[in-house]
Amino acid sequence: PTIIEENNPVGIETVSAGASKNLTDILTQKIEESIGKENTEGFRTLNGQTLINAPKPEQLVEDLIAEAQKNFDPESLRPKISDASLKISEDNSREAFIKYFESFNKILLEASKNIPKTLFDENKMSISDFLKTKVVYEQATNSFYGLTVPRSLLDIHKKELELLLTKKNVFEKMANADQDPMTAFLAVDELLKIDLEFATLKADIEVWIKENKL
């Protein structure tokens, strides 16, 4: 068996393109509902002319998203991982590497069991799933902070933490969709990008393991 399990996605779970579209559909509806609440009067009459408080929700959503994208910085979702916050060991023995990757696997596989099964079921998904998923990522990152890492694996460790925390932050924004649907909508776009980075990281880990004959 390999050090990194074949079924270990490194990022706990992945988001398909179809699931991502479903997420944006849900959040678009939230934005439209928000617009509706702010324009409860609908049509009104002034000097004999019928006026509407807002354009069609669909067009307004597009306009709002375009404007919000100018002010949304995806990098704000990404934390900076400092060496001082980590448990770094100078033991770079084969045994230390194996122990690290065994713990690495255990953290992620245990976390994957706690992801809500309804998260990417288009018929059952709800915003409450986002909060539950955010908590799963938070717990996983806490475990990684508590994990002792051999210095030779520090870059891998920091990248894993960065991506886990970024995904936690994305789900946190999504969980707040009732209060801030626009930011939640924009945050969803980052999910597929993060998963691509997780895939790259997994490939890098596999190369490292092969080169070090673990």
Go through the PLM ranges and name each one.
Residues 2-93:
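N-terminal Sec/ER secretory leader and immediately downstream segment
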Residues 10, 15, 61, 135-136, ...:
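Extended aliphatic helical segments
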Residues 53-123, 156-214:
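C-terminal amphipathic alpha-helix
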Residues 126-131:
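A loop-to-helix transmembrane entry motif
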Residues 132-140:
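Amphipathic alpha-helical packing segments from all-alpha helical-bundle domains
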Residues 140-158:
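Short, solvent-exposed, charged loop/turn and helix-capping segments
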